[in-house]
Amino acid sequence: MATQTKHDWADDEDLEETTTTTAPTTDLPPPQKIQNKDGTWTIIEYRINDLGQKVKATRRVRYVVRREVVNPRVAERKTWAKFGDSANDPKGPAPDTTTVGENIIFRPSVNWRKEAKDEANDPNAQAMKDKLKDKKVKCRICNGEHFTARCPYKDTMAPIGEAGPADVAAGMGDEPAAAGPAAAGAAGAGKKGSYVPPAMRAGAGGAQGERMGGKYGERDDLATLRVTNVSEMAEEQELRDMFERFGRVTRVFLAKDRDTGMAKGFAFISYADRDDAVKACNKMDGFGFRHLILRVEFAKKAQ
């Protein structure tokens, strides 16, 4: 007795697909294209649907030819062959290499010559031009040539000449910044009805208090370097490994964004010895790190 072969469910599905796709398609009539009197065309096509039935599709279309007058130089440039990385790209602008901007048409006014002449003869306008000729945009935070609102350090540094909580250098242990609350308490002692803590009252011996570690716990600004133009992907350990080649590093502070966790572009490196800091400043200023050139200088003491 012959044994019957049992097919798997996947084999049965493949068998059904093959029987469906092998429907007879050789007996279909060729497509027809008929021109009508009103200028339209009637296109008749035949095909086999999913049920294996012969279907006739009739379409009526109208061909419209639009002519556009362009600059012959522009038309010639469109026929140029692409080269380099875009040699195999199709015709037209590629989105990864070309940015298509808005075509702005310049339309001068009718009295533009008279307006230009009046503007040239205006003494106030000329005085304003002479006044602003040598002036440049200067940031109030980092003294860079950009607007203060666009400064990359506006969230972490205070404007020059102002004391603020965002000043990174002031937050690393400077004595002038710590003396602020004591001065405020002394000034507020003269106001009637205002409360002044006992430690800040006039004549209090421990007005400012002592820091943990005494004088050895304070930061030496003379041995602190300010590193700018730091990559967003930089890490504190990488900076420590680079700067520890010149001496013992006591602290590394890399400013990072609170939301993204990426570096903001600057860092502070503190050395135990100023001679090591001078050596590191001379060697690392202009050093290439993560495709960027580092700018290393001594940190300025907070005012």
Swiss-Prot record:
Gene Ontology MF term list: RNA binding; translation initiation factor activity
GO annotation, biological process: formation of cytoplasmic translation initiation complex
One GO term describing the cellular component: eukaryotic 43S preinitiation complex
Keyword flag Cell membrane: no
Region (Disordered): 1-38
Main location class: cytoplasm
Role this protein plays: RNA-binding component of the eukaryotic translation initiation factor 3 (eIF-3) complex, which is involved in protein synthesis of a specialized repertoire of mRNAs and, together with other initiation factors, stimulates binding of mRNA and methionyl-tRNAi to the 40S ribosome. The eIF-3 complex specifically targets and initiates translation of a subset of mRNAs involved in cell proliferation. This subunit can bind 18S rRNA.
Oligomeric form and interacting partners: Component of the eukaryotic translation initiation factor 3 (eIF-3) complex.
Family of this protein: Belongs to the eIF-3 subunit G family.
Protein name: Eukaryotic translation initiation factor 3 subunit G
Organism listed in the record: Chaetomium globosum (strain ATCC 6205 / CBS 148.51 / DSM 1962 / NBRC 6347 / NRRL 1970)
Biological classification of the source: Eukaryota, Fungi, Dikarya, Ascomycota, Pezizomycotina
Gene: TIF35
